[in-house]
Swiss-Prot record:
Protein purpose: Catalyzes the phosphorylation of erythritol to D-erythritol-1-phosphate.
PANTHER family to which the protein is assigned, alphabetical: SUGAR KINASE, XYLULOSE KINASE
Source organism: Brucella abortus (strain 2308)
Lineage, opening ranks: Bacteria, Pseudomonadati, Pseudomonadota, Alphaproteobacteria, Hyphomicrobiales
Underlying gene: eryA
InterPro entries named among the record's database cross-references: ATPase_NBD (IPR043129), Carb_kinase_FGGY (IPR000577), Carb_kinase_FGGY_CS (IPR018483), FGGY_C (IPR018485), FGGY_Carb_Kinase (IPR050406), FGGY_N (IPR018484)
Pathway terms, separated by semicolons: Carbohydrate metabolism; erythritol degradation
One of the record's GO molecular function terms: erythritol kinase activity
Protein name: Erythritol kinase
Pfam families referenced in this protein's UniProt entry, alphabetically: FGGY_C (PF02782), FGGY_N (PF00370)
Length: 520
């Protein structure tokens, strides 16, 4: 193994997402200098299969780094460290000589549904949840490996290590098989110890497969040098320190502002899905009786982020605007979704608040947070003849606010301040709705690539650019948080009452959704 280099003024953060793999260059103060991206590819198959080529993923990573080097002359010599994060969950198996054992089952793969149902009903599932803080679902490596062990045990028989996406890239960058404390503890371990837990492994029925679980390393404390083979593939210099980041949700939360500044702040990413996070001391974690959500370690001693995710966020807005676009279009003058997005706030402001109740379960996968029901579906309640399209638009936006509140309620109290990221944060209507829904001021993070930044922050601490993560947060995160926007008191009061109806209706509709699903 080559020796570690100790020079340079750039840190590269790699974020291998489900849609795009990005390599982003930052200076030591957290300023984004340049980025390069490669579109990610995965294959959808029968029975809920969604797979991704391990070899292609590494090739895409190497290409992104080479493309970044083409944009930044002298990048190899200037790079002080590299850090990698990526899409969470999923199962990336490697065998002899670190060769892939088939394609990865990524987090979108739903083949383990029957195994999840069986394990969730088992006598040890609550103990598993109490240790991991994480609800069991088809996304997770534990459920997927348990399913493989039932239907295709030869996959596990031929494997020597079960990795996640970022772990696979780290193996290719450094030659080291490892995983990080976040994915290790929410999948197979205990968020209090950040180590594997025998009870969890037994609850999943994977005692005989424990040998596949790799070493746990913390990339903010230890690094490995870039291998000669990886250097040749990426155009970087052998020996450059490489940090294994935490899972992408944790890195995005860190980069976007889940920690720092106002105590008790929450961080919500409003994209196709909604991801809602609270950083808390381990002792303050509230585990709900439904057994949903995630508890994910952060690269700060004793601090974790509690997470609830709702399946459908901006896809609800896309849906209602696409309905309008379809109605407005003619062969001579087509109207697109993009044409209508600028009108969202105007329609919202032309309507009455709280006139209609909307549940934003528009995803065909149903809902996963703060409750799990694959049959959950969207719907309007309270329509009258006086309602027009602006009322529908407003109710959809308000439904996202209610879903956000529902997720934070499952984690305990409302946040003292809400930091929001994602393209939808540009909408004043959405910002005001989220603020009133949780009755807290909102601030928008200007950080463009929060996941890559979070990973790079770990490398910055590891190489000694900052004495501790709190010091890095003060320079990389807090200056990028926008002005505080206070909630409208009248709307906050109205939404307090609306949420009661929202939740009561959500609970009452569950058997209706199930009956609709059984009739299809």
């Amino acid at each position: 193994m080559s020796a570690m280099r100790e020079k340079g003024d750039i840190i590269i953060g790699i974020d291998a997402g489900t849609s795009v793999l990005k390599a982003v260059a930052f200076d030591f103060s957290g300023r984004q200098i340049e980025s390069a991206a490669v579109r990610n590819t995965y294959v959808t198959g029968d029975h809920g299969a969604v797979t991704q080529s391990l070899a292609q993923t590494w090739q895409d990573c190497a290409r992104a780094l080479r493309d970044l080097g083409a944009k930044l002359p002298g990048l190899a010599q200037r790079t002080a460290a590299i850090a990698v994060t990526g899409q969470g969950d999923g199962t990336w198996l490697v065998g002899k000589d670190n060769r892939p054992v088939g394609d990865a089952w990524i987090w979108l793969d739903a083949r383990a549904a029957s195994t999840v149902t069986r394990l969730a009903a088992g006598p040890m599932n609550r103990a598993r949840f109490e240790a991991t803080g994480t609800g069991l679902n088809t996304c997770q490596q534990g459920a997927q490996m348990a399913h493989m062990d039932t239907i295709a045990p030869e996959l596990l028989d031929n494997a020597e290590a079960a990795l996640h996406c970022k772990d696979w890239l780290y193996l290719n960058l450094t030659g080291v098989r490892a995983t990080d404390p976040s994915e290790a503890s929410f999948t197979f371990g205990n968020f209090r110890t950040r180590q594997y837990d025998d009870v969890v492994i037994e609850a999943l029925g994977l005692q005989k497969r424990r040998n596949l679980l790799p070493e746990i390393i913390d990339g903010s404390q230890s690094q490995h040098p870039l291998s000669a083979e990886a250097a040749a593939a990426t155009g970087l210099l052998a020996g450059t320190p490489v940090s294994l980041g935490y899972v992408d949700m944790a890195m995005t939360a860190l980069g976007a502002g889940v920690c720092g500044g106002t105590a008790g702040a929450g961080c919500s990413t409003i994209g196709s899905t909604g991801v809602h996070m609270r950083a808390k001391p381990v002792a303050d974690i509230h585990l709900n009786k439904e057994g949903t959500g995630y508890v994910i370690a952060l690269p700060i001693p004793g601090i974790v982020t509690q997470v609830q995710t709702n399946m459908g966020a901006t896809i609800n807005i896309d849906w209602i605007l696409q309905v309008a676009a379809d109605l407005m279009s003619t062969p001579e003058k087509p109207v697109s979704l993009g044409d209508l997005i600028p009108r969202l706030d105007d329609w919202f402001n032309a309507s009455r608040p709280g006139a209609i109740l909307y549940h934003p379960y528009i995803s065909e996968a149903g809902e996963r947070g703060p409750f799990v029901n694959a049959n959950a579906r969207a719907g309007f309640i309270g329509l009258s003849s006086r309602d027009r399209f602006p009322e529908l638009v407003r109710s959809v936006v308000e439904g996202l606010g209610m879903a956000t509140r529902d997720c934070y309620a499952a984690m305990g109290e409302m946040p003292a301040e809400l930091r929001i990221t994602g393209g939808a944060a540009r909408s004043k209507a959405l910002r005001g709705t989220l603020s009133a829904a949780v009755n807290a001021p909102v601030r928008v993070s200007a950080r463009e690539e929060a996941g890559a930044a979070g990973a790079a922050m770990m490398a910055a601490v590891a190489i000694g650019a900052y004495p501790a993560m709190d010091d890095c947060i003060a320079e990389w995160v807090e200056p990028l948080l926008g002005a505080s926007e206070a909630p409208d008191a009248a709307r906050a009061h109205q939404y307090e009452e609306l949420f009661v109806a929202y939740r009561e209706a959500r609970l009452a509709l569950a058997p209706v959704w199930d009956k609709l699903a059984s009739g299809k």
